[in-house]
Amino acid sequence: MLPTVFIVSDGTGITAETFAHSILSQFDQKFRLVRVPFVDSLDKAYATVEKINEAAVHDGRRAIVFTTLVDSESNDIVKRSNALVLDMFQRFVEPLEQELELKSSHAMGRGHQNADTEEYKTRIEAINFSLAHDDGQSNRNLSEADVILVGVSRSGKTPTSLYLAMQYGVKAANYPLIPEDFERGKLPSALAAYSEKLFGLSIDPQRLSEIRNERRPGSKYAAPENCRYEINEAEAMMRREGIKWLSSTHKSIEEIATTILQEIRLDRQSY
């Protein structure tokens, strides 16, 4: 029986879930994850306790609960459940209150009240930019890009571009390197003026073949020998052009994005 882990939040639960994944990944154990977002009333807190207790009875062991509930009364209710409750909010807020000699607002959703701020607008603009400049579909306003990702098809450019835009407000374009570029031995002409904005993504040829076979099974596009050729040529071109690059094979989107931000020295963040 897999241990049941509850992610309990008065908001979306994204913060709690991200933290929980980081902690749980340290253990060689699979878990059953149950997300309980928007617990913003006492009634919902009591209903959550019922779910947790039912899971404990079913599993024959205490559940594990990661909570970011701001309301202390709701938090106290959840803490009375048959579970190991890891209160992420209080764990950090109380020491900060002591250190800063200030009381926190304890207001629900405080981290999402900036919907009309410049940061939010910047993020929306970045998302629209990344969508418009996905896979080289537009060369307009490339000068506005914070970074232009290059690499062969299916090397992770699109999800990385969108993650950079959504999470950090980074205007990330992406451009595919194709066999015609390798035959010419040059980058696409549209990128020539933006060499300082380029960052490359590569990938293990075998993994690339597997991904491409999901899209076009049995095609030359997905053939292992073609994938090896494209990767070898792309990496040679990036070295020749002095483009910083990394392999996306064993990295998460979060790791790739963080590395890119460090390499291009962009200090932009949306909250």
From Swiss-Prot:
Keywords attached to this entry: Kinase, Nucleotide-binding, Serine/threonine-protein kinase, Transferase
Binding site for ADP: G151, V152, S153, R154, S155, G156, K157, T158
Record protein name field: Putative phosphoenolpyruvate synthase regulatory protein
Similarity comment: family membership: Belongs to the pyruvate, phosphate/water dikinase regulatory protein family. PSRP subfamily.
EC numbers: 2.7.11.33, 2.7.4.28
Catalytic activity field: [pyruvate, water dikinase] + ADP = [pyruvate, water dikinase]-phosphate + AMP + H(+); [pyruvate, water dikinase]-phosphate + phosphate + H(+) = [pyruvate, water dikinase] + diphosphate
Molecular-function annotations in GO: ADP binding; ATP binding; phosphotransferase activity, phosphate group as acceptor; protein serine/threonine kinase activity
Purpose: Bifunctional serine/threonine kinase and phosphorylase involved in the regulation of the phosphoenolpyruvate synthase (PEPS) by catalyzing its phosphorylation/dephosphorylation.
